[in-house]
């Protein structure tokens, strides 16, 4: 099964994405198939292989883990629809929220 996650990174360092979208294969150790970095100025970067050149392959945490702050207080996440991921992937544009507010999930 494929799951689509929108991760908000509050206080992301300059040059890092403030929103990251993941396409996660839940039946293959929660590895990302593709991801999209979205930066504070609105530009996006499609990443067809998140693990290309990686020394260590790390699974993508669940939305519940991210919202429980297991990975840090600065992360909030929600599940999104495939259509939203694909629209941003294809258009390379993002006009959505750049900060996670309140409880997401």
What residue spans do the PLM features occupy?
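Broad, structure-driven detector of short, well-ordered beta-strand segments within folded domains
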Residues: 18-27, 105
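Short, extreme N-terminal segment that most often corresponds to the first beta-strand
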Residues: 1-19
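Short, compact, well-ordered microdomains
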Residues: 60-105
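Short amphipathic alpha-helical "recognition" segments used for binding
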Residues: 7-10, 27, 85
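Intrinsically disordered, low-complexity segments enriched in polar/charged residues with Gly/Pro
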Residues: 8-10, 23, 64-66
């Amino acid at each position: 099964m494929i799951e689509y996650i929108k991760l908000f990174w509050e206080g992301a360092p300059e040059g890092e994405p403030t929103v990251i979208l993941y396409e996660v294969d839940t039946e293959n150790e929660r590895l990302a198939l593709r991801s999209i970095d979205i930066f504070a100025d609105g530009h996006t970067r499609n990443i067809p292989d998140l693990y290309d050149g990686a020394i260590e392959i790390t699974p993508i945490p669940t939305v519940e883990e991210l919202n429980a702050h297991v990975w840090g207080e600065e992360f909030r996440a929600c599940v999104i629809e495939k259509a939203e991921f694909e629209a941003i992937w294809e258009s390379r544009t993002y006009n959505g929220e750049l900060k996670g507010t309140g409880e997401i999930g």
